[in-house]
């Protein structure tokens, strides 16, 4: 839940930033209407119960309604959709849901079986991509926290160069206050 919340908090901050771009032809106060946050979870039995609780708190998941079969046929995935006005804050690895002004459109795909990351990417592009027909897509793993305007800058790279097929951002280690995370060998390397 902490990794998921860290990522979603960063995504929400980026949407808020795009909504403050008053002089933009593309963005501005209704920018949130042009952005859909898609979350794909790999396996109903595998999803962390606390992450499920965060999704339920955001309004995009309902516990107990997913079924393995419908009319005798196996279910592949469960799709939930909601426009939330609930925010996420994270302090000392404690996730808190907070009221927020900026709406965020959410699509949540809970795959019935764990079929690994590439299958999740396929779901994202083949299922949601065909329906949403986005100008750009940004893929983030849970735990990756985008800076408050980094998604905007990725979008800007595509906007300035329409023939650009891909771009990536810079990844920085989260050092923590006073660099305390550097004591952790996983962060320090």
UniProtKB/Swiss-Prot annotation:
* Any single biological process term in GO: cell wall organization
Instruction: Cite the InterPro entries for this sequence.
Output: Chitin_synth (IPR004835), Chitin_synth_fun (IPR004834)
Regarding the membrane, this protein is recorded as: Multi-pass membrane protein
Q: Where in the cell is it found?
A: Cell membrane
Task: Give an example GO cellular component term for this record.
Answer: plasma membrane
Which EC main class describes this enzyme? transferase
Where, if anywhere, are coiled coils annotated?
none
GO terms (molecular function) for this protein are: chitin synthase activity
Catalytic activity annotated for this protein?
[(1->4)-N-acetyl-beta-D-glucosaminyl](n) + UDP-N-acetyl-alpha-D-glucosamine = [(1->4)-N-acetyl-beta-D-glucosaminyl](n+1) + UDP + H(+)
Q: What is its EC number?
A: 2.4.1.16
Q: Which UniProt keywords apply?
A: Cell membrane, Cell wall biogenesis/degradation, Glycosyltransferase, Membrane, Transferase, Transmembrane
At the top level of its lineage, which domain of life is listed? Eukaryota
One Pfam family from the UniProt entry?
A: Chitin_synth_1
* Record's keyword annotation contains Membrane: yes
Question: What does this protein's UniProt record list under function?
Answer: Polymerizes chitin, a structural polymer of the cell wall and septum, by transferring the sugar moiety of UDP-GlcNAc to the non-reducing end of the growing chitin polymer.
Q: Which family does it belong to?
A: Belongs to the chitin synthase family. Class I subfamily.
Question: Which protein is depicted?
Answer: Chitin synthase 1
Gene for this chain: chs1
């Amino acid at each position: 839940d902490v990794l998921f919340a860290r990522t979603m908090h960063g995504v929400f901050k980026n949407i808020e930033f795009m909504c403050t771009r008053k002089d933009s032809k593309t963005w501005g106060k209704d920018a949130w209407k042009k952005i859909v946050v898609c979350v794909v979870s790999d396996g109903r039995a595998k999803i962390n119960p606390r992450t499920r609780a965060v999704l339920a708190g955001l309004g995009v998941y309902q516990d107990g309604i997913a079924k393995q079969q419908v009319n005798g046929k196996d279910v592949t995935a469960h799709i939930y959709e909601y426009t939330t006005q609930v925010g996420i804050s994270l302090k000392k690895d404690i996730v808190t849901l907070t009221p927020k002004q900026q709406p965020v459109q959410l699509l949540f795909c809970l795959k019935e079986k764990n079929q690994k990351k590439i299958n999740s990417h396929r779901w994202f592009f083949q299922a949601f991509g065909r329906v949403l027909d986005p100008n750009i897509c940004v893929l983030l793993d849970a735990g990756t926290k985008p800076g408050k305007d980094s998604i905007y800058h990725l979008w800007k790279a595509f906007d300035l160069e329409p023939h650009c097929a891909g771009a990536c951002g810079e990844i920085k280690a989260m050092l923590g206050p006073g660099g305390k995370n550097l004591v952790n060998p996983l962060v320090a390397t």
